[in-house]
């Protein structure tokens, strides 16, 4: 009943600005061609790589875009976000989505992807945008001769210099990740939509790591994310989500094999920098015994908690939500895992139960566990639950992340799920983890802050 975040390669290695590559559409509505394209290989591992592409508009505003390039060494795009990709052999075309097609003068649009390679992974030699070959400059034309004026030529009004974009600083002790889908959507938006999406983009949220990439790539993601948080003097939040038999084959089904899990966790743990909060395996205990293929799930959780804690993590074992299991069940299962290498448990991950209900439920569990601490995911619980768990409509953003020290056992309110990322292909939503702007705006609009 939980969903993963879209996997994305985030390391700032091998970044390549492709010769100031520029182009823009030549249609009458989108004239004055000129832009910059930055193609950055952000991470690379045997057989795979991640990349980010940023388009900066140096000409007139455009309402949609299509970027074309050709791979010459057999590279292939496997998963792309913030755009739609089509390929024909080595030829690649990426088109804008309904919500990020508009680029004002001086504005940017970006997308990212994971790809495959073999032998070599050279940067594409050229790009074209909306049919115009990238040249690196705004094309010039011969000016039409100006007749001699009979009146003094007025002094033209100076064009103001665009104000550089500044990454806002987070307002709490938790880290705001500027690489999330919500953050990129906010950057691309304008008007009322931008004001609403700011509520999501500038609120600290967890980074999900799972087996949608191999273990070494997942380790690199963790190292990059936690490293950026530590450099900013903030606390990172991670979700580890790769347990065998994950989600019992539902919308977020998957996980690594039983024989691979310990090695996968150890590899990922090697990437930890600082002391991140880690939510360990959403739904794993709540679904214990519900399907085959789980192996020694309690043993896996014990091992993962130890491996992560020894590398500096503060581990909270996920225990479901307030309307799922009676108090006795999570108490029994959490006791089986134990707390030698965990500071507490987590509730309401990716769910919609109110903070009040979740806190009352957590306190009952905590009392039975000798006062163990707990955290609550409040990312989407502002209107509580309507009984649905997969993309219910009419929900709202919940309380913003904050550390708690009120003597109740509650350690923190966190945004574990990333609002705007789909729960799965249900109720009109895209696949799990994909950005869904419509529901992001709805939850932001319904928020009580």
Swiss-Prot record:
This is Endoglucanase A. The active site is at residues 247, 283, 423. It catalyses: Endohydrolysis of (1->4)-beta-D-glucosidic linkages in cellulose, lichenin and cereal beta-D-glucans. Belongs to the glycosyl hydrolase 6 (cellulase B) family. Residues 127-170 are annotated as: Disordered. Residues 139-168 are annotated as: Linker ('hinge') (Pro-Thr box). Residues 438-449 are annotated as: Catalytic.
